[in-house]
Amino acid sequence: RNSAENMLVEILLSDQQCWKHLLEWEGEITPRINVIIQVSREILSKNLHLTPTNLMREISTTDTNEELNRWISELAMKDISHLAQEKRELIFQDCLKKIHKICICEKLDDIKKQMTTKKNNGLQYHQELETLQTLLFELKKE
């Protein structure tokens, strides 16, 4: 998960064309990537460029967690310019798909735990079962 997130953000910070793909992404994402998406939309609404500096500045005004800014700062220092544009786009799409799959698997684990708890307490778990089936179907589409 971390390696996919890291590579995704490294590419984002070095390639402006990938922002559009991320902002249009409809799959599952991690909480950190979700914050980046929300903040990037704020930046764009102010007619600013999506740069590491603007991203970190906007995050610091909306999120008190310095860990996210530190993470972005570290990734912004990495040089991936040696990768060809096509290769970067392919890796970016692969990272999005991997993050999507990981998030679905994490949700599946959570639903299974909820079902087990309800089963052990003698409660109905039909809603969890439906959610589980939906997630399994989504995972199978991958």
Task: Annotate each language-model stretch with its function.
Residues 1-49, 72, 105-108:
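Non-catalytic protein-protein interaction segments used by genome-maintenance enzymes to assemble
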Residues 45-142:
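Bacterial replisome coupling helices
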